[in-house]
Swiss-Prot record:
Entry protein name: CinA-like protein
Family: Belongs to the CinA family.
Positions of transmembrane segments: none
Top-level taxon of origin: Bacteria
SMART domains: MoCF_biosynth
Pfam family, one: MoCF_biosynth
PANTHER family linked: NICOTINAMIDE-NUCLEOTIDE AMIDOHYDROLASE PNCC, NMN AMIDOHYDROLASE-LIKE PROTEIN YFAY
HAMAP family, A to Z: CinA_B
Length: 413
């Protein structure tokens, strides 16, 4: 089965809105072993939409379109669908009934403009929308099934799962499934990972490997397709074991996890506690830690000590040390970590200090110079890094590197 996606909206072409709908639809179809062969994006132009529908219908079994089903003048998808299929645009009484019921539930009066959303191609079948005003619909164009969904992501997602996917599976008529297992890798480039895993899919028929860079990590996606659920699971687990063997400690998160949730799980399992002292990251690491529910069980405090005086007053970093080595140094990072641990009474304390830029660098300590330190009962260690990129990238990779320090320390507990 060949499927295609059509995203509709001027806001997509202008870069004002990111098209998350297509990604969600493609991923959901892939879970069922259906690969999206093509994707187009067009603006709110009736002729462009109709032309795209006709073009995609010629080479695909199913086309799923999103957007342009609202009540305003620029919502022209239904008219374009009628034009492409040679049908009249008529008032769909079933859609109107759903719309009236929706406003009754809200306790609000329906604006006359909303009635435009019920003008659909003749004999179109409805796709119910339980959370919004725009009904979806589907109809054939030659041998292709055209399906239309609203562009609001939350509405689209419900309609996709409840109606669209079952219809597509019914049309396919077979029961092959695709299962995906994702491992998160940090500290290796995509090229290095690919070289280490180059023979993985060739040595295991039915298994494919794909890579997705989400700076500063790389997602290694293992996919297996077949009819036997048990065989798919076994194939994926075998592939994942080999990835872990070849990439070692660079695999920082398993399927369904991130490096942040992995660290959270390890804190819960070990019963250890944490304090942070941040300078160049300005609380970014603490934000990642506290974004995970339940972090209050192990996270005590974070001191964002941007100024030297704050490092001295809050963390006890000696003024003489700051003057001698500068705030960006291994010695100061270690003093910050020890001070945070003493302040909080935690098992672990991690500190970062660095130059995120774009200003503040020097020949000896250019922009991107970062020191990370970790203190525990046994002592304190520190390491220097030189990260490249703009301010946001430097801060991001510093935070992820810090999370990896915590992950590795907790694994050694």
């Amino acid at each position: 089965m060949k499927t295609a996606l059509l995203s509709i909206g001027d806001e997509l072409l202008l870069g004002e809105v990111v098209d998350t709908n297509s990604a969600r639809i493609a991923a959901r179809l892939a879970d069922e072993g259906i690969v999206t062969a093509r994707k187009l994006t067009v603006g709110d132009d009736e002729g462009e939409i109709a032309g795209a529908l006709e073009e995609l219908a010629r080479g695909h079994d199913v086309v799923i379109a999103t957007g342009g089903l609202g009540p305003t003048d620029d919502d022209v998808t239904a008219r374009a669908a009628a034009r492409a299929t040679g049908r009249r645009l008529v008032l769909n009484e079933e859609a109107m009934g759903h719309l009236r019921e929706f406003f009754v539930r809200l306790g609000r009066e329906m604006h006359p403009a909303n009635g435009r959303q019920c003008l659909l191609p003749a004999k179109a079948e409805l796709i119910p929308n339980p959370t919004g005003t725009a009904s979806g619909f589907y109809l054939p164009l030659d041998r292709c099934l055209l399906m239309f969904l609203p562009g609001v992501p939350s509405e689209m997602a419900v309609m996709l799962d409840e109606t669209v996917v079952p219809l597509v599976l019914e049309r396919r008529g077979e029961h092959r499934r695709t299962r995906t297992l994702t491992l998160t890798v940090f500290g290796l480039s995509e090229a290095e990972i690919g070289a280490r895993l180059s023979d993985l899919d060739r040595s295991r028929p039915g298994l494919t490997v794909a890579y997705c860079v989400e700076y500063p990590v790389v997602q290694v996606k293992l996919r297996a397709t077949g009819e036997d659920e048990g065989a798919l699971t076994a194939l994926l687990e075998d592939g994942a074991a080999l990835v872990r063997e070849r990439l070692g400690g660079h695999v920082v998160a398993g399927d369904g996890e991130t490096i942040d949730t992995t660290v959270a799980r390890l804190f819960r399992e070990t019963g250890m506690t944490l304090a942070l002292a941040e300078s160049c990251t300005g609380g970014l690491i603490a934000g990642r830690v506290t974004a995970i529910p339940g972090s209050s069980a192990y996270f005590f405090l974070s001191a964002v000590t941007y100024a030297n005086d704050a490092k001295a007053r809050l963390l006890g970093v000696p003024q003489g040390l700051l003057a001698e080595t500068g705030a960006v140094s291994a010695e100061v990072a270690k003093a910050m970590a020890r001070g945070a641990r003493q302040l909080a009474g935690s098992d672990l304390a991690l500190a970062v200090t660095g130059i995120a830029g774009p200003e503040g660098g020097s020949p000896d300590k250019p922009v991107g110079t970062v020191f990370i330190a970790l203190a525990d009962q046994a002592g304190c260690s520190a390491k220097g890094y030189h990260f490249r990129g703009d301010r946001d990238r430097i801060r991001t990779i510093t935070a992820v590197t810090a999370m990896d320090w915590l992950r590795r320390r907790l694994l050694s507990h």
